[in-house]
Amino acid sequence: FLGTVEKPKMLCDVFRETNVKRKEELDRGDIVKATYQRWERCVDYLVEFLKLTQNVEDIPVRDVTSGIIDDFEHFLRMRKGCANNAAVRYVRCVKNVMQYALAHKWITHDPFIGKKYQRTHTERQFLTEPELKAVMDLDLKDIPRLEVVRDTFVFCCFTGLAFCDIKSLLRSNITTDTEGNTWIRKAREKTGEMSIIPMLAVPRHIAEKYATNPVVIQKDVVLPVITNQKMNAYLKEIADLARIEKHLTTHLARHTFASLSLSNHVPIESISKMLGHSDIRTTQIYAKTQDKTVYEDMATMRRKFDCVMIN
């Protein structure tokens, strides 16, 4: 009598199985959209990695070794351009799947034993007021591709919108209250949290400037935003023209908004609401950066008075 051989559980299949649970967590509001998307993206990266290294799209979960995990981490950093924290997040997704397989007795050994993955603390870079003014003062009328990128960047510096949110910002997201104040009301693409942002004169002027732009009219958006990749490439040129040493990116604009708000005494609770943070601790990261800046700004005064003693 011959028994049937049980088909082995496959790594990417198990991953997709756990992603069904992640989707349920997303629907319940237990995790944010960006977390779920990371899990989905991790499966795609695994398939790409296995095709590249083993010429297959999946392997039995029992065949996952410590070496394969190391190779996948290397693939994330070298092939996908992941910084340390992004690579760590993806590898931890795989670790979670392996623990799921271990709990179901599909594997007998955890290949992650002895492995540690540490996220690095990253400082939030932002533009100072003089640096932002230097960007705003650039005359780019003869270089329209840079002008629209500069204007989009400045709009984000005064609203705190992330790239995906400014790209999907519709004219219907801008409202005027009974007192004539203009507001942006938009759910964040990343978390679904509502951002409620008062529009100051600068972003209002920028929105009006592009009101007749063909792309704006056709898509009913506020600004004719190009791709994130192109925008960051053009921001490098803008930084050179403005003689700014910092690495300008679309996300640095969001950090700049938080920093400028803090330095102009806007309460952190209000900043958190405008940024659409679901947890105020996320906003407090900017406050820590601000504390460091304040300390550095006091350096001249400190040098002057440190040696002075009261009689």
PLM regions and their residue ranges:
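Short, polar N-cap/turn motifs at the start of nucleic acid-interacting alpha helices
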Residues: 173-180, 245-246, 266-285, 292, ...
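Basic, Lys/Arg- and aromatic-enriched nucleic-acid-binding interface segment
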Residues: 84, 88-90, 107, 111-163
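C-terminal catalytic core of Y-nucleophile DNA break-rejoin enzymes
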Residues: 121, 189-208, 216-237
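Catalytic-site neighborhood detector that most strongly recognizes the C-terminal catalytic loop/helix
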Residues: 126, 188-192, 204, 228, ...
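N-terminal DNA-binding recognition helix of tyrosine site-specific recombinases/integrases
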Residues: 34, 42-52, 59, 69-70, ...
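C-terminal secondary-structure termini that scaffold catalytic or DNA-interacting sites
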Residues: 214-217, 301-311
